[in-house]
Amino acid sequence: MKQMRLWGFLFLSSFCQVSYLRANDVLLPLSGIHSGEDLELFTLRSSSPTKTTYSLRKDFIVCDFAGNSIHKPGAAFLNLKGDLFFINSTPLAALTFKNIHLGARGAGLFSESNVTFKGLHSLVLENNESWGGVLTTSGDLSFINNTSVLCQNNISYGPGGALLLQGRKSKALFFRDNRGTILFLKNKAVNQDESHPGYGGAVSSISPGSPITFADNQEILFQENEGELGGAIYNDQGAITFENNFQTTSFFSNKASFGGAVYSRYCNLYSQWGDTLFTKNAAAKVGGAIHADYVHIRDCKGSIVFEENSATAGGAIAVNAVCDINAQGPVRFINNSALGLNGGAIYMQATGSILRLHANQGDIEFCGNKVRSQFHSHINSTSNFTNNAITIQGAPREFSLSANEGHRICFYDPIISATENYNSLYINHQRLLEAGGAVIFSGARLSPEHKKENKNKTSIINQPVRLCSGVLSIEGGAILAVRSFYQEGGLLALGPGSKLTTQGKNSEKDKIVITNLGFNLENLDSSDPAEIRATEKASIEISGVPRVYGHTESFYENHEYASKPYTTSIILSAKKLVTAPSRPEKDIQNLIIAESEYMGYGYQGSWEFSWSPNDTKEKKTIIASWTPTGEFSLDPKRRGSFIPTTLWSTFSGLNIASNIVNNNYLNNSEVIPLQHLCVFGGPVYQIMEQNPKQSSNNLLVQHAGHNVGARIPFSFNTILSAALTQLFSSSSQQNVADKSHAQILIGTVSLNKSWQALSLRSSFSYTEDSQVMKHVFPYKGTSRGSWRNYGWSGSVGMSYAYPKGIRYLKMTPFVDLQYTKLVQNPFVETGYDPRYFSSSEMTNLSLPIGIALEMRFIGSRSSLFLQVSTSYIKDLRRVNPQSSASLVLNHYTWDIQGVPLGKEALNITLNSTIKYKIVTAYMGISSTQREGSNLSANAHAGLSLSF
């Protein structure tokens, strides 16, 4: 069992008394299997004053040590002095710790100094048992440039199921530049007693101020680990940082009492390139995924997702001091849950905490987060839970929500700031110069049952709220209850049925001050008015010009609402006073009621804003009335010129299929003799593109597929060819959202007759092209269309190879006459605002004229043929594709012109053919430059067998 090449370097005498290695630098090779049959000879000790290096050539397995009754640290490796290194001497180096049981810390390794694992093909810690870490150090613990690391099914009756950093001085645990996966699976830290707490199911640091860092790695996974504090990682007095990792970092189904996945003082996610996922982690008490004093998320390009995590408080995150999320990519909190009103997604209990959410270059979204009335209640039972995203229990020192232009913070679940205080919540603070985005409170994603209960859509902020810039939108029937509201800039927009209200015991200082009010048209099906209400002694002051806000193109293109008069309203009510004029005046504090004409795309008309005739001092109603003119202006993006243009995609596919079959050599039985039958086939690729700098609607077409066919000789100089080509293609245009995918089938028949130098040829091709298009309209819906293009192409041509006296070199002028006719069938789209497209037709008569330089090396068993040709192509007669279209719902009709292509082109082609016995390999590359900056290129290759 013992196969260990170590005896020339040290003598292992007993477990308690071992010969020590004493040298400045010690290098020890390791390989084979080292098992624990003899407990006294199992431990490998080192004490070099500088460093000890173990060099691994292949697998080295340390295993099967039953030392539960041994209470001295370090069963397999014990390093008492100097740094310890495990390095590779070959790319196959691997180190495994397996089935090692020890009644102390460090079942696999215990070191008083720094330990580094570097360059290993694999490092495995599996099925080990200790009272604190399989690998335990009082110095730095580093994993650098390894291919894979696996820690699985390890258990500790104390901190650190797999890895433990201990000691009184600040040290560090690093995972850096590892090239493969880092896996921590089903590790467990059991809470044995006060001196052996179960902190960190997989990784733990009980060394004060010691950082745990994962940087520049690939995939990282913590799954089904368990601990008392930190199901996966614990570092109460230091920082846990994930930075610049390139693939997914995942925490899945980890469990703890506090911090289902992570328990630390600082939890940092910096510059993550891959996604970072916290999924189905659970804490019996606080912090379903993360429990920390400080949480910082910034500069992460990948998505950050907290989904289906649960706890008593803080379903996803529980923070004591600072939660600062700066979203460079999407950040989502989805379906997390907590107990009571303790933060379905984020919970902050302490007074003086700081919460900053900034949608920088990515959106932040809270959706489906809940708080339950009973801890074990079923989450799908609607009577047992309330929607809630964030709960701030103590009065916060700072609370800010910011979004850059084009980005959003979306609360589809309410938030609660429970303690009354006068520290303002800032929306898009002036210190953030680019903060012109939207903060949205919405009930749009609630189920019909949950929309009936206001608690599921009411956000309570017991602070003054200040809107500095950008947009605050309250929509989908949501309610925002605040201590007071001051609009210093930006736009306050309310959707039908939504409400902004003060709450609590208000004084005369508490006001709702609005300078720019918007009507949000996000829910046209609702006729409920929006409401702005001031309770108790609070008042409302409103000024400025009202406006219509939202994804308004969805309204103006809505055939049901925009084609006829439409009204919506906002009620302003206060127990004390609503300050707003009944007619226009010069005072800047007065609300100017004006008429606004709409001249964009969709139905034309104007908005008129007016006061209700039943207004009082305590209640006023602003009514926005839409009056259409009856005219309609089509958005150019919906013209659909792309539809008839797809005939050019069919045309290019038809041409390449025909050119492959018309191979000058394979069709010439005098050059490549054919007696009975030839079968051939191979791949095909083509791309056609217009120069985007010279065409605003440049066309891009790509084909990829294959063909199969056969050649049959009718006589010694007459060959009939037939082929079937299948192409899969995609077509798109710049500045047009439409994009189609197609499957093209082409059948080709060709007849060739050769007399030494003279060759005559003719061909006929028929094609069926099935096109499918999908168009997604932001905030509107999706339309889909499918149609059929079909047609045929025929050609006749001749070529003459000379001089006759030179066998190996030929100059071959050629000329062809080609005619193509293609038809696009009419069709009707399905989905959002469908369009009808009539049929379109394209015909083209072209005359290619050119010359080829041929090199022929003909042998008895093998032959080589090379051909370079250039040709000028003139389209003699052309009917460009054109069509007409109409909107199905209002019958608005318009004409469509397909993208035209130039009528003159230059082509360069390179063909090569190699024949050996009955096998022939061929390849062709071609490029065509057409006037109007249209460039196409194609390539094909294949094999043929002759019989």
From Swiss-Prot:
- Gene Ontology cellular component annotations, sorted alphabetically: cell outer membrane; extracellular region
Keyword terms of this UniProt record:
Cell outer membrane, Cell wall, Membrane, Secreted, Signal, Transmembrane, Transmembrane beta strand
Q: What is its main location?
A: secreted
Locate the Autotransporter domain: which residues? 672-947
Instruction: Give the signal peptide, or none.
Output: 1-19
Q: Which branch of life, at top level? A: Bacteria
Q: Name one Pfam family in it.
A: Chlam_PMP
Task: Provide the membrane topology annotation.
Answer: Peripheral membrane protein
Compartments (UniProt record): Secreted, Cell wall; Cell outer membrane
Disulfide pattern: none
Similarity comment: family membership:
Belongs to the PMP outer membrane protein family.
This chain's protein is named: Probable outer membrane protein pmp19
Q: What is the lineage of its organism?
A: Bacteria, Pseudomonadati, Chlamydiota, Chlamydiia, Chlamydiales
